[in-house]
UniProtKB/Swiss-Prot annotation:
Regulator of peptidoglycan synthesis that is essential for the function of penicillin-binding protein 1A (PBP1a). Residues 300-310, 330-340, 513-528 have a biased composition (Low complexity). GO terms for cellular component: periplasmic side of cell outer membrane; periplasmic space. It is found in: Cell outer membrane. It is a lipid-anchor. Belongs to the LpoA family. A lipid is attached at residue 27 (S-diacylglycerol cysteine). Interacts with PBP1a. The keyword Heme does not apply. This is Penicillin-binding protein activator LpoA. Gene3D superfamilies: 1.25.40.650, 3.40.50.2300, Tetratricopeptide repeat domain. Residues 300-340, 496-528 are annotated as: Disordered. GO terms for biological process: peptidoglycan biosynthetic process; regulation of cell shape.
Length: 678
């Protein structure tokens, strides 16, 4: 028998070994906390991974995985799930988790399009308290909350973010910085006030000044950029130029020695094609000069005795033609011109070139594919046209290598390095109206449109542009025929300033909404509902006969003190307006092309003479003239951001897709006169 003393000694000696084994066994099965690496941004995964880790963890580690899952869900566009998980976060968080929660709340607000809510949350965060990867997200949230509206705060956010980014992201940041700078007007830029130690911002503003001074002269612009890079060698933009300015340095002018003009010369659209051809050939032979965008006030002459337009090819004007794929319903006869032009600020002209070879191709006589093949064989250096929308769609499918100034635009714009789009359409006019009304400080617009496809297109274009400019909900109200309007006047019903919200087709995103009460988007001051008293601007798209009923009906229902300013498209103005009509339209603002607003009286007289005083066709004539200017500056429009031509159809600039934007003249009826809108 073994002595009991020996057994106790042996057991005592074995105990440390057993305990050590148990300890090491426990260490072997324990998984270290990996959430920290993910929180710091040194590792990344998708939401499914984070959710799985969250289910398998507890305490602070579980909260970290939960925060990571929320961040991933927002990034993946699963906003509803992100909100649900966000609202399950516990109240007790450490400082690091609390900062992450606040940042996530702002990012969710941005995903929900609640920009004001996001800005309020971001104001509670001190960037210096954040980790480096959180700082990059914070500045990006500040940038997104600005909605692209240029401001000193946006510039500061972009500059603060730049050092935190990788090479690819740096280029995007620099391009965004330049986009903000080049989107400002010179007046906006002159009001900026910066601190003495903001050297990088000062450098950017000096580059902006170079651009303002030289944007219509590519050679001077190249020299100015090179000089700026020498003066600011440490500026991020000097080390890595904005893409738009790289394009300027690589600028080469396009040739217009051999031009192909693609137009419909037969059928209902022939009257438009031949009128554009007339304007184009006139400009080719005599050249063009800058046109005043704004004019001085003058009494409107009574032109009721003007001869009426004569019918050409069975169609008196674009308004009478059933050509749905051209530019939609065309405006009727247009307003009395006011006084002489003021001095132009964008001194860009297109010289005459009578010797340039011009060949006309009839798009109504053969398929566009055959025409393009022939154009290429003929050696054209640039194509102007086609005019009809369906032909522009065919043009894109052809993948032609030729430089093309299309005289319309497709439903879905495609960015092609060799194509620009120049259209005169009601949608284009509606976008300009949105910009004009927004510039006048209005917040709550109502669009009053005909019950038709035209009305739907105009409403969608206006709402898209309004929201792009940072506005909220736009209301719409539709009206019927002239006989229905007459009945409304006789019945004394009037028109209430109410309507239903427009949801722009291109911006609908059902994945960005949520019914969760904690982080649900709530309407801001400019995201109103159909409260008639809140409407402060009404944009009317109507014929002269329709607006003659509509304006009195608005006054009948709302009184003269409704507080809403009335605006109209050029469709509602008329070249033969007498004093009674002008007095009836008192206070109404309407848009017009500069040529017919008095910005180029000699050309207006020439155009009206050529089209038998049809103001609608005179617009197409002006389009032909401007097409010559654009063809001569095709490379500048395509490559030089901010290049501007003060044309007869508007102040012409191009967006990044080379869609030509037209800033129109705005006029107003005042005591029987037509004057510039204030």
């Amino acid at each position: 028998m073994v002595p009991s003393t020996f057994s106790r000694l042996k057991a005592a000696r074995c105990l440390p070994v057993v305990l050590a084994a148990l300890i090491f066994a426990g260490c072997g099965t324990h998984t270290p906390d990996q959430s920290t690496a993910y929180m710091q941004g040194t590792a990344q995964a998708d939401s499914a991974f984070y959710l799985q880790q969250m289910q398998q963890s507890s305490d602070d580690t579980r909260i970290n995985w939960q925060l990571l899952a929320i961040r991933a869900l927002v990034k993946e566009g699963k906003t509803g799930q992100a909100v649900e998980l966000f609202n399950q976060l516990p109240q007790e968080l450490n400082d690091s988790q609390r900062r992450e929660k606040t940042l996530l709340a702002a990012e969710i607000k941005l995903a929900q399009k609640d920009f004001a809510g996001a800005q309020n949350l971001l104001a509670k965060i001190t960037p210096a308290d954040l980790e480096q990867n959180q700082q990059a997200r914070y500045w990006q949230a500040k940038i997104d909350a600005s909605q692209g509206r240029p401001s000193i705060d946006l510039l500061r956010a972009l500059i603060a973010q730049e050092p935190l980014l990788g090479a690819k992201e740096k280029q995007q940041n620099i391009d965004a910085t330049w986009q903000a700078l080049s989107s400002m007007t010179q007046e906006q830029a002159n009001t900026l006030v910066i601190n003495a130690d903001e050297n990088i911002l000062q450098g950017w503003l000096d580059l902006q000044r170079v651009w303002f001074d030289n944007r219509n002269d590519p050679d001077m612009m190249k020299a100015g950029i090179a000089d700026w890079q020498k003066r600011y060698p440490n500026n991020p933009g000097a080390k890595m130029l904005p893409t738009q300015l790289v394009n300027v340095k690589a600028f080469k002018p396009a040739s217009t020695n051999k031009i192909a003009l693609l137009l419909p010369l037969n059928g209902q659209a022939a009257v438009f094609g031949r009128t554009i051809q007339q304007g184009f050939e006139a400009a080719k032979n005599i050249g063009t000069q800058p046109v005043a965008a704004q004019v001085a006030a003058a009494p409107a002459a009574d032109v009721a005795e003007q001869p009426q337009p004569q019918t050409a090819d069975g169609v008196a004007s674009p308004a009478q033609a059933s050509v749905s794929d051209l530019t939609g319903d065309q405006p009727a006869a247009q307003p009395v011109p006011v006084s002489a032009p003021a001095t132009s600020t964008a001194a860009v002209s297109a010289p005459a070139n009578p010797s340039a070879e011009l060949k006309i191709y009839d798009t109504s006589s053969q398929p566009l594919s055959q025409i393009l093949s022939q154009v290429q064989q003929d050696g054209a250096s640039i194509v102007v046209g086609p005019l009809l929308k369906n032909n522009v769609e065919e043009l894109l499918k052809s993948n032609t290598p030729l430089n093309v100034l299309a005289l319309n635009q497709p439903e879905n714009i495609e960015n092609r390095v060799n194509i620009c789009y120049f259209a005169l359409s009601p949608e284009d006019e509606a976008r300009d109206a949105a910009r004009h009304i927004r510039d006048q400080g209005k917040q709550a617009p109502l669009v009053l449109i005909p019950r038709s496809a035209l009305g739907d297109r105009v409403a969608n274009a206006f709402a898209q542009e309004w929201q792009k400019l940072g506005g909220g909900t736009v209301l719409q109200q539709k009206f019927g025929s002239t006989s229905e309007l007459r009945a409304g006047v006789n019945g004394g019903s009037g028109i209430a300033l109410t309507g239903s919200p427009i949801t722009p087709r291109a911006t609908t995103d059902s994945g960005m909404t949520t019914n969760n009460p904690t982080l649900q988007t709530t309407p801001t001051d400019d995201q109103f509902t159909n409260n008639g008293g809140r409407v402060d601007a009404v944009y009317i798209v109507a014929t002269p006969g329709e607006i003659a009923f509509i304006k009195p009906m608005i006054a009948m229902r709302n009184g003269s003190q409704s507080g809403a300013t009335l605006y109209a498209s050029s469709r509602s103005a008329q070249g033969t307006a007498g004093p009674d009509f002008r007095l009836e339209m008192e206070g109404l603002q309407y848009s017009e092309i500069p040529m017919l607003a008095g910005g180029n009286l000699p050309l207006m007289q020439q155009a009206l003479s050529a089209v038998n005083n049809d103001y609608s066709l005179a617009r197409m004539y002006a389009m032909g003239v401007d097409a010559w200017s654009l063809a001569n500056h095709f490379s500048q429009m395509r490559q030089v951001q901010g290049f501007e031509i003060n044309g007869n159809t508007g102040s012409l600039t191009a967006n990044p897709d080379c869609v030509i934007n037209r800033k129109l003249s705005w006029l107003q009826y005042q005591q029987g006169q037509v004057v510039p809108a204030s």
